[in-house]
Amino acid sequence: VKEILIKNNKTTGIKTSDGVEIKSDLIVANSDAEYIYNQLISKNVSAARSERRKLKLATKSLSGFSLLLGLDNSKGKAVSIDHHNVYFPSNYDSEFDDIFTKQVPVKDPTIYICAPKDPLMTKGGNKEAWFVLVNAPRHQVDGGWDWRHGGAEYAQKIIQKLDHLGLNVSPRLDFMKYRTPADL
């Protein structure tokens, strides 16, 4: 979607990046509100102006740093974990101090892992595909954390933490892709 179309302060549809217009009187946007109001809705829409002002003044929330991991169990001992897993740090409060006060990547983050057992999610019988998510400060170039730098190093720290938790990721790691808050 390139634009949410609005006429007389009512939605009329969307325009795609290839110029196709799809008519609709209802639009559901599951995206960041700032992106919607500043990128998808024309600056000429008067009904959106007050929302833009509110968003500009609002304190921004946290974000996420994710890893997509492909694991090859022929390279190391597999561990048995559930489909959904959450590993909490010893000092949960410090996670939010890092995010909101210091505005730095979390030193000891809560880690969520989705490890589906569906064979259609992997390349073979001895493989696993994990989605790993940790809380992170939002991408903010001025006065916050600039996620255009340091993503690979932070991904390695998370892998080390997974190993420390006994999940034996490093020796089995066959594929890794990470996404920072700047990518979202």
Describe the predicted segments one by one.
Residues 1-2, 24-25, 172-178:
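Beta-strand segments within the central parallel beta-sheet cores of soluble alpha/beta enzyme folds
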Residues 2-124:
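Mid-domain catalytic core of redox enzymes
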Residues 72-184:
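C-terminal segments that line or cap access tunnels to active or ligand-binding sites in enzymes
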